[in-house]
Amino acid sequence: MRPIDIRPDKLAQEMLDYTSKLGQGMENLLNADAIDTGVSPKEAVYSEDKLVLYRYDTPAGVTPQKTPLLIVYALVNRPYMTDIQEDRSTIKGLLATGQDVYLIDWGYPDQADSALTLDDYINGYIDSCVDYLCETHEVDQVNILGICQGGAFSLMYASLHPDKVKNLVTMVTPVDFKTPGNLLSAWVQNVDIDLAVDTMGNIPGELLNWTFLSLKPFSLTGQKYVNMVDMLDDPDKVKNFLRMEKWIFDSPDQAGETFRQFTKDFYQKNGFINGGVKLGGKEIDLKNVDCPVLNIYALQDHLVPPDASKALNPWSAARTYTELAFPGGHIGIYVSGKAQKEVTPAIGKWLNERS
C-alpha cells in the first residue's frame, strides 16, 4: 500500500486558509443585516380570521391580464419562499409575464383555530378569496396556482367549484399519496393521528419541520452546515444561506382538525385516488376538474415524488392537460436560477395562451 503523502507545509497552509475563512465568516455573520424575505411590493386587500390576501404591484410598463392569478400555498411553511429574494422570485417572474398576482397568507394558527376543518379552508377561505377576486375584477373565473399541499387544496376546490376556475397550475402537488419511494407517506402510515391531535390540539410546526428534515438527515441536518464553511467568506452567499434557514425553521402550527382530516383522508386513505372524501356534503372527484391544467413536478423531489404528481393525468378530466418536469428538488423549483429561467416563464406563457 502506498503511504499517504502528508506535506507539513501544505497542511499548515490549508489550516491557515481554513482559519482565515472562519474568521471572515464570523465577521460576515456578525455584520449581516436583518434577513429580508418577501421582497416584491404588495398590498393586503382582504382578510378573514388569520388569513390575509395580498395583491402584488404590477411592474411599470407591464399590462396585467384580465383574469387574476390566485396563489394557494401550503399550510406547513410560509409563502415567502415564492418571493425569497430579488433574483430568486417566482412572484417577480409571474408579474413580468403579465399575471395579476394574488397570494393567500394563512398566517399562524393558534388554539382558537384548532377546530378548523378542510371544509373551512376549501369552501370557506379559498372560496371567499375567489369571490373577492371575481367581484373586484368583474370576472366569473380566476386562474389558480397551487403549491404542494396548496395544490391539493386547489384540486379539491376545482373539483367542488369547477365553474369558478378558468385555468389551474399545480406545482409539486401530491395526487397519489402511495406511490413507491414516497418516504413521507410510508412514515405516516402507522402514526396514530387521532392520538396526536387529541393530545396536542394543534400539531406543532417544529414537530413537522423535524419530520421533513429527518427524511434526508445527512444532507439536511449535517452536511449543509459543513459545506457552509466554504461560503462564509462571501457575504452574499451567507445571506442566501440565512434566508433559506429562516424559511426552513419558520413553520406554523397546524390546525388540529384540518391536520387530522388531511393526513388520514389523503396520506393514509389516498383520497384523490380511492375517493370517499366529502366536503360540504359533496364528494371530491378529480373528474370534475375539467379546466385546462398545467402540472409541474420536480424530478429529484424527496417530499412529493414525480409519480405522486403525475398521477393527476389519468384521473382528471382536464380539457387540456400539460406536464412540465423540472430537473431539481422540492425547493429548487422556486429558488434556483434554472427555475427563474425556465419554470416561471413557462407558467406565464401557458396562462397567457389561455387568457
UniProtKB/Swiss-Prot annotation:
Forms a heterodimer with PhaE, which may multimerize in the presence of 3-hydroxybutyryl-CoA. Keywords: Acyltransferase, Cytoplasm, PHB biosynthesis, Transferase. Residues 68-333 form the AB hydrolase-1 domain. PANTHER family: POLY(3-HYDROXYALKANOATE) POLYMERASE SUBUNIT PHAC (PTHR36837:SF2). The gene is phaC. It holds the Pfam family Abhydrolase_1. This is Poly(3-hydroxyalkanoate) polymerase subunit PhaC. One of its GO terms (cellular component) is cytoplasm. It is an enzyme of class 2 (transferase). It is found in: Cytoplasm. Polymerizes D(-)-3-hydroxybutyryl-CoA to create PHB which consists of thousands of hydroxybutyrate molecules linked end to end. PHB serves as an intracellular energy reserve material when cells grow under conditions of nutrient limitation. Belongs to the PHA/PHB synthase family. Type III PhaC subfamily. Its EC number is 2.3.1.-. It comes from the Bacteria. It catalyses: (3R)-3-hydroxybutanoyl-CoA + [(3R)-hydroxybutanoate](n) = [(3R)-hydroxybutanoate](n+1) + CoA. GO terms for biological process: poly-hydroxybutyrate biosynthetic process. Disulfide bonds: none annotated. InterPro entries: AB_hydrolase_1 (IPR000073), AB_hydrolase_fold (IPR029058), PHA/PHB_synthase (IPR051321), PHA_synth_III_C (IPR010125). Poly(3-hydroxyalkanoic acids) (PHA), of which PHB is among the most common compounds, are prokaryotic intracellular storage compounds with potential uses as a renewable, biodegradable thermoplastic.
